[in-house]
């Protein structure tokens, strides 16, 4: 594996944050400097955490996932007041979801290791599984290449019900068949059998989406020391009750803090991402197997336009009786994370970084400071045949990231012809239409009754010219079919569906191609935190 860094243009909050623009950095409580991390440690030492209760729960949960010894030791270390965490989170995608989930975890592991060495304190890596999520459409699929097309392959559970990812039971038989269909789209390699067994071992131990995700991730990172937490685990919810109560008692201040911070963001020229009603409480409650966002209505806490209604006392009582019924929304999830874990740093993707910039005053309302927010490492893998295609087309490795691949293809094709086809046909159509306009005028003067026919004649001539243009383009493309297929392969591999590779393809493809130790070998590479994109040649 060879690793290179390239500068990929970014926009908005992320670009300005990484470029050190003071205006947007003022929306965060810490700069990404070593002094800021030292200050963060001092700030965390002044706070209290329910460490022992958390350790008890995490030991039980990670042991069930068959965690390695390094993970168990890291969980136990959390009981020490001088231990801190680097944390990130993601939904429980089937087969772990897109590659960026793996890259988030690699980011967490690397930053935790670096900060432990530089700060001289124990720093453990934590990955937060968003188990409360009810949106199965975001986690029930993966993308594959089939018949020279990119296809979204959805897992259709035979027993679907509206429940969270932590509670949605998987039909193992159906899921196994779905996985087999996925692997049929991959090339058969020396690793295929082992990877299928690897995945099936995790599936057999699982009852829910979160189980399957947790087992796969733990198995993939078994020696890394990674700690997993299911955000919707009933035992964790019990520990969170005091903070749920605090959010309910301060929901107006939370909403005001969000509104005020979004006004700051607007004044800086950015468009806020988070959209909420002015009366929202920022807490979900599970009612009749549905996740309902609570709102304030004349002092009552209501859901589904008033279908359900609770007084403050009733809501608090229900939190104490059934904490597993409650979960956070996009605004309060970061707050709950801050309440539960002594967070040295939070690692997020571009979207997360943008919406965290809207939360500074929300954190302050609760009496917290935002942790340092570190953009995750971004990675693209270039396989040997794709590197060959790039070379054959005289493209640089950075070209597909800086330019639209379709545009690169069009430019290459136009360079194979002395005169651009589009330009020549535009010119020809213009000349012919000028002649025909004059001809129509001549016809109209002699026989006005033929005017309509003359107009249709113009339309048919134009149709024939466009047909000729299409046929010529098709023949030119056929002549250069070999080279154009290289562009298609480059597009599919590096910019599938016009998106970054890590947002579409799944890690199982790479495990199948390069072996079960693929992720371990990637983790051995030195990644930098300078905002550049990492390209790994395989």
UniProtKB/Swiss-Prot annotation:
Q: Which GO terms describe its molecular function?
A: ligase activity
As recorded in UniProt, its EC number(s) are 6.-.-.-
| Keywords, ordered alphabetically | Coiled coil, Ligase
> Where are the annotated coiled coils located?
460-484
| Pfam families given in the database record | CC_BshC, Rossmann-like_BshC
Look at the named UniProt entry and state the broad enzyme category this protein falls under: ligase
UniProt cross-references to InterPro entries, sorted A to Z: Bacillithiol_biosynth_BshC, CC_BshC, Rossmann-like_BshC
Protein family:
Belongs to the BshC family.
Give the protein's biological function.
Involved in bacillithiol (BSH) biosynthesis. May catalyze the last step of the pathway, the addition of cysteine to glucosamine malate (GlcN-Mal) to generate BSH.
Q: What is this protein called?
A: Putative cysteine ligase BshC
Q: Organism, per UniProt?
A: Bacillus cereus (strain AH820)
Gene responsible for this protein: bshC
